[in-house]
Amino acid sequence: MDHNFSESLITRKEAVVSSKGIVASQHKLASRAGAKVLAEGGNAVDAAVATAFTVSVLEPWMSGIGGGGHMLIHDAPSGKVHAIDFGMRSPIGLDPEDYPLSGEGVASDLFPWPRVVEDRNIVGATSIAVPGQVDGMRVALENFGSRSWKESLQPAIQAAEAGMQIDWYATLLIGSAAAELNHYPCTRETYLVDGHPPAPPWTAGAVPRKHFPYLTKTLKHLAEAGPRDFYEGRLASTLVEDISRCGGILSRDCLLYTSPSPRD
């Protein structure tokens, strides 16, 4: 048995019990944001939406308003389960011929699919699909929530203003993607420090934070302008311009995305 300390650490999570409600996410502060919504009288969907927006600030390597997802909602009085599908979609102009297989094994991604030339399907502007997250949250709130859109974004805005804590896990995830992040000025500026992953201090002390001024500004605008601005308004124009400048094919027509109505 290898007793090397660096290879034998055990990470544990304490069990939590509640008679009223529990919020679970990949970041404690995001879960706290959702729990606070419940404590203030919001329902489970209100808490889920607030948590989702907040975790997009605190866990950007797995969550974000540029992504998508699915939601299941159980209505206890009726016993019905409702589903909302707001997954990403391929851009209208996408041509599979632009993504030839390289024959070099599997991708350098979480998913072991066949590798594409230059990793075009997982890195850079050519990997960006039509995002459904923002509209999915709109559909959830309008059909099952009790809070306003603006209220629901406040925890995420507060988290963005405070900045993301750079702990060992954040350093690990950013470091693992540093080569790709260095390729583009915007991601290099956002996540790296002088081209290197940010890191917490070796000794005890205040944990450094990474601030995302552009994301903070975007969330504030989204809270005021409403969710459809992301697909039809100023944010949509900025999104398309930036992606086009980097070689992507996302268009304004692609962004005319409307999440389907909830289904049982």
What are these regions (language model features)?
Residues 1-32, 36, 44-225, 230-232, ...:
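Noncatalytic scaffold domains of N-terminal-nucleophile
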Residues 260-264:
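A short, hydrophobic C-terminal helix/tail in secreted or cell-surface proteins
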